[in-house]
UniProtKB/Swiss-Prot annotation:
Its main location: host cell. GO terms for cellular component: host cell membrane; membrane; virion component. Keywords: Glycoprotein, Host membrane, Membrane, Transmembrane, Transmembrane helix, Virion. It is a single-pass membrane protein. This is Uncharacterized protein B117L. The chain crosses the membrane at residues 92-112. The keyword Nucleus does not apply. It comes from African swine fever virus (isolate Pig/Kenya/KEN-50/1950).
Length: 140
């Protein structure tokens, strides 16, 4: 189960339908709740006063009626996304799988670092011993 939310080039958002997701159900309810939104606007005269005082908001609602129904009916259920979110269970870098991959890579890097450190230590030790042996041979 998963869905993608993204902005298009005009700044409008859209997503693919997923009937099992609660956010998608809330959004579907918002699109089908236009009578509820009309009743809400009739019962709240301050909203009408706000629309009269803010003509740009009224123009926006006239240009995007789905947004008007969405904003009044489910204002607290789902907020407009501003970036693209890809939320899907099919991705390997998701949830527990991502954590396990990160731990595996971390352990691999620690192992390689220890092997490299041991190799450098042994090489330096060998070079120092060879140098000291050559000094001892020269001093005799």
């Amino acid at each position: 189960m998963g869905y993608t939310i993204q902005l298009d080039k005009d700044g409008d958002y859209y997503w693919d339908d997923d009937s099992h997701d609660p956010y998608m159900r809330a959004n579907a309810a918002a699109f089908h709740a236009a009578p509820h939104a009309a009743a809400f606007n009739a019962a709240a005269p301050h909203a009408a006063a706000f629309n009269a005082a803010a003509p740009h908001a009224a123009a926006f609602n006239a240009a995007a009626p789905h947004a008007a129904a969405f904003n009044t009916a489910t204002h607290h259920a789902f907020h407009e996304p501003f970036i693209k979110l890809n939320l899907t269970d099919k991705n390997i870098f998701n949830g527990l799988g991502f954590i396990l991959i990160v731990i595996f890579i971390y352990l691999l890097l620690i192992t390689l670092q220890q092997m490299l450190t041991r190799h450098i230590y042994n090489t330096v030790q060998h070079c120092v011993k060879a140098h000291l042996d050559s000094k001892n041979l020269q001093s005799r």
